[in-house]
Amino acid sequence: MADSGSNEEAMKRQAPSVKFDSPSKPDPQQVSQQSNQLSSQKSIQQSTQSKIDPSRIDTKNTTVTTTRPTLDTPPEEEEEKRDGFGNSFEFVLTSLGLAVGLGNIWRFPTRAYNNGGSAFLIPYLTCAFLFGLPAVYFEFLTGQYQGKSPPVIFRRVRPILEGVGWMGVFVAALVAIYYIVIVSWISIYMINICRGHFALWSHCNNDWNNGTSCITMADQYLCKNHTKVMANSTLWNSSLPIPDKMVYFNGACQDANGTDVSTATEQYFMTYIVQPSSGMLDFGGFNWPVFAAMSVCWLLTGLGILKGAKIMGKISYVSVLVPYVLVVVLFINGVFQDGSGVGLEMYFGTPNYTKLYEQDTWTEALKQLCFSLSVGHGGLISLSSYSPKRNNIFRDALIVIIGDTTMSLVGGGAVFATLGYLAKATGQDVKDVVKSGLSLAFVVYPEAMTRMPVPWLWCFIFFLMLFLLGASTEIALVDVFCSCIYDQYPRFRNRKWIVVIAWCSVLYCIGLVFSTRAGYYWFEMFDEYAAGFSSVCTVVCELLVMMYIYGFRNVRDDITEVVGHARNKFTGAIGAHSWYFTANWMVISPSIALILVGLSFVREYPYMGRHDIYPAVFDIFGWFLSFLPVIIVPIFMLLNFIRCRNRGHSYRTLFMLQKQHASYRRIAANYSKDQLALQDQLPDKEPWDEENVDLTDSESESRNAASGDVPIDDVATIDTSSTYHQVY
């Protein structure tokens, strides 16, 4: 009877960390004394007896000593503290909002056109299978299983590697700083469309036009296609008053003095909207319309993340679903325009398979995929941490990949159908009107829209779609850092406005340089350097840490906990449990990412070959931005060494799996005696749990009872011969 009583009492005090005390049977008198002590602490008994998990007892030995539970909070309490999406559909929509962005509309179409047309889909879809889907699936798994932000996740794997989690956070911050500039330009276009400017940007009779260098697109066509050859140029003596002479030289129209001329829509964007100075170091004062637009956009971004994941999920119904509707509307409208067939044929119908043998084609496919999916930005991990732990992440990863690719294909179709119409209307070939990047969105497409019936409507629909795509991505990027602060400083969960205002203000102040007249050149620097190299480095580090340090077998066990066991051999072979993903995360994806890292060093110096506009400081500061997230890793290594010393813990704990990790109990159940003996060195709380509150003894006891923590001095011996036991 004494043994039975001791078993019952011990089962109530079961903890995840176990160590061997002695091979002898427990003394009944000691057990009785401990029982009396436990009976005087009724509140602690009631809270802890439901936390027992006999699966963590080693059956090879008869007596073990247990210590306090090691999870910081029980799962049910943690879910109450941390925000979450209303349902899995909202999580998918918000993830799509981060992945599907402006690059799907203005980068993908021109990259596809320049790299083989429809043949570009072969390397793009191949890279999506080899890199895109595994990367998204991996980041969803990492975030959802732990239910924490990236720095906390990697700190729990090994505290010394906390900086790996911060890498993606800083990449997201760098992208958010300049990404909102594009959203600001788009918002200015939307406002000006409502003011009637859609009828003004297609001709040269406006105050902002340079009368000596402004031409219409029709004039540009005449300049470019005149047959009289003169050396390396073509001279056209126009009967029009402006310009009276133009030369087509080295790919651009020039006037008689050798000055480049530009179309009316180009001048509207560059002269009226951007208002650039002579170079990146010539700041020239503020561009007040851009300054005002940025201020409003930052205000809207702050409001979008102020209420957390639940509100973000609701916003995604509009910011994500509406762009899909609008892009279909634009595609249908473009298809029914005269000349659209020529544009669609250039995009879909004329594959150039010889491009598949060129390295640049595959490189461009990889770059487009990385930028489009936002892998390595910390955002996908952060968003998935708000998702329920049993959510089907493999299904969601497939949806994100399919949704992103669909937007690229349909958006590209809408763009090229419209370009075909514009080429027919101006008497040019499609190749003559194709532009890349910003020019496609802010110059060529508006030019085409003004020639359609009801031009203001189509212009507004196009820029509204861009605004929603950009805003949804910006909100997700800014929220990444805020999530990290909420996790490491829980007291701010109920005062989120402090974190949101502070973080948005910091990014806003840094981004003020974009609202100067040199802002366009600084934007180009951020766009060129901020995300590519650093995001790929982040992916490599995350994969290496999780697959080789945390362990690929543990990752596979995490998958089983999240999505359950494979239903049959077929789903086990190609589904969430497929060994393909394990091999991919260990070898294929890191190799692909390292190739991208190497290729990122191959670029033109100076940028665009214009040392007068882009001096050496452009590339120097650009590379500093690229390496900034990487520098974060050793900085946090040093900080954790200092933190460990100040807390009086052994430095060995910096290289050990922490008790707060979601799989610690499962993994510790298989530890050897020597490994179990080392677990006592691990801290029972996160550093921020010790620093954030100063509790009295009674408050501490109450909190321990609520969280399932038992005072470290209270131990109980357990007879593992009990039949109430199973191996995990």
UniProtKB/Swiss-Prot annotation:
Q: Which UniProt keywords apply?
A: Amino-acid transport, Cell membrane, Disulfide bond, Glycoprotein, Membrane, Metal-binding, Sodium, Symport, Transmembrane, Transmembrane helix, Transport
Where mainly found?
membrane
Q: Which ranges of this chain reside in the Extracellular compartment per its record?
A: 106-119, 184-285, 336-364, 418-451, 517-531, 600-616
The upper taxonomy is: Eukaryota, Metazoa, Ecdysozoa, Nematoda, Chromadorea
**What residues does Na(+) 2 bind to?**
A99, N104, S372
Q: Where is the composition biased (Low complexity)?
A: 29-50, 60-73
Q: Gene deleted: what happens?
A: Impaired capacity to form and maintain dauer larvae upon starvation. RNAi-mediated knockdown in a pept-1 (lg601) mutant background results in a reduced number of progeny. Dietary supplementation with glutamate does not rescue this phenotype.
Q: What does this protein do?
A: Sodium-dependent amino acid transporter that mediates the uptake of the L-enantiomers of various amino acids, including L-proline and L-methionine, and also of acidic amino acids such as L-glutamic acid and L-aspartic acid. May additionally have a role in potassium-dependent amino acid absorption. In response to the availability of amino acid nutrients, may play a role in dauer formation. May play a role in promoting fertility.
Q: Where does the chain bind Na(+) 1?
A: G97, V100, L469
Query: What is the name listed in the Swiss-Prot or TrEMBL entry for this protein?
Result: Sodium-dependent transporter snf-5
Glycosylated where? Answer: N210, N225, N232, N237, N257, N352
Cytoplasmic-side segments? 1-84, 141-162, 307-314, 387-396, 473-495, 553-578, 638-728
User: Which residue ranges run through the membrane?
Assistant: 85-105, 120-140, 163-183, 286-306, 315-335, 365-386, 397-417, 452-472, 496-516, 532-552, 579-599, 617-637
Biological process according to GO: amino acid transport; sodium ion transmembrane transport
The residue ranges flagged as biased composition, category Acidic residues, are 687-699
Q: Which domain of life is it from?
A: Eukaryota
User: Tissue range of expression?
Assistant: Expressed in the INT-9 cells and posterior cells of the alimentary canal of the intestine, gut epithelial cells, the pharynx of some worms, two cells of the rectal gland, and in DVA, DVB and DVC neurons and amphid sensory neurons ASI, ADF and ASK neurons.
The answer to whether keyword Transmembrane helix applies is: yes
Q: Which family does it belong to?
A: Belongs to the sodium:neurotransmitter symporter (SNF) (TC 2.A.22) family.
Record gene name: snf-5
GO cellular-component term (any)? plasma membrane
| GO MF entries | gamma-aminobutyric acid:sodium:chloride symporter activity; metal ion binding
Q: Where is the composition biased (Polar residues)?
A: 718-728
Query: What are the cysteine partners in each disulfide bond?
Result: C204-C214
Could you tell me the membrane topology recorded for this protein? Multi-pass membrane protein
Give the residue ranges for region: Disordered.
1-84, 687-728
Where is the protein situated, by its record's location annotation? Cell membrane
